[in-house]
Amino acid sequence: MAALKPVGVNLNITTSATSAQSAAIAQQTDSVRIVAETAGCHVAIGTNPTATTADFYVSPTDDAIISLGPVGSQRVVNVTKGASTVIDFPEGTGSPFAVGDAVSLTVPNASTYDFEHKIVTAVDSTSNVGGFYNTRITIDHDSSSVTAGFNNAGASLRRSIKVAVRTVSAAGKAYVQQVQVS
C-alpha cells in the first residue's frame, strides 16, 4: 500500500447531476486524490473542465489517485505590465508552460502582481533578440493598473488546474487533495 503525503489545502465540492467546478488549484504535485462522499462522481481535470458521465468515475466506496502529469513551475525574473502581462524566466531555463496552459503568479511582498488561473497566449524562446537570451511568455492578464516596482526575490509561476465533478443523479460531496505518493 502506498503512503500519501497531503500537499496544500483539501477542497470539497458539492456534487449533483450537473457539473460543478473547483476554484483554481496551483499545481504542487503530480497527483490528486479524489474521495466521493455519499454518491460516486465523475471527474474531469483541466484548465476549465466540465465533468460528464463519460469522464473518470470515482466510487463512493474507494478513493482515486489521478495523475496530473509533471509539475510546471518556474522562477520569474521580470514582469512587464500591460493589457497582457509578459513574464521573463531566468536565462537558460526555458518554459515548462505551453500556449493554452493556465498559470498562477505569486510575488512575495508585492501581492498586487499576483494573479490566479490566467491563460498563456504566447511562448517566445527566440535567443539573442537585442542581447536578450531569456524565455518570455505572454499571459492573458491585464496588469496595467499595478504601480509597484517588481522585485523578483522569490517570484514564481505555477501551472494551475481546476477539478470538475458530477454525479449521475444523487447529491453528495467530493474531496480533492493534492498528494505525494510514496
Task: Provide a role label for each language-model segment.
Residues 70-182:
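Small/polar beta-strand repeat architecture
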Residues 37-55, 177:
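Short, surface-exposed beta-strand/strand-loop-strand elements in extracellular ectodomains
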Residues 11-12, 51-71:
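Intrinsically disordered, low-complexity Pro/Gly/Ser/Thr-rich segments with frequent PxxP/GP/PP motifs
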Residues 27-30, 101:
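Short, solvent-exposed coil/turn segments at beta-strand boundaries
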Residues 7, 28, 37-39, 62, ...:
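Repetitive beta-strand solenoid architecture
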Residues 1-22, 144, 169-182:
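Short, intrinsically disordered N-terminal pre-domain segments
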Residues 9-28, 49-52, 81-94, 110-111:
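Surface-exposed ligand/attachment interfaces on beta-rich extracellular proteins
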Residues 32-38, 165-167:
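Asparagine-centered strand-capping/turn motif at beta-strand->loop junctions
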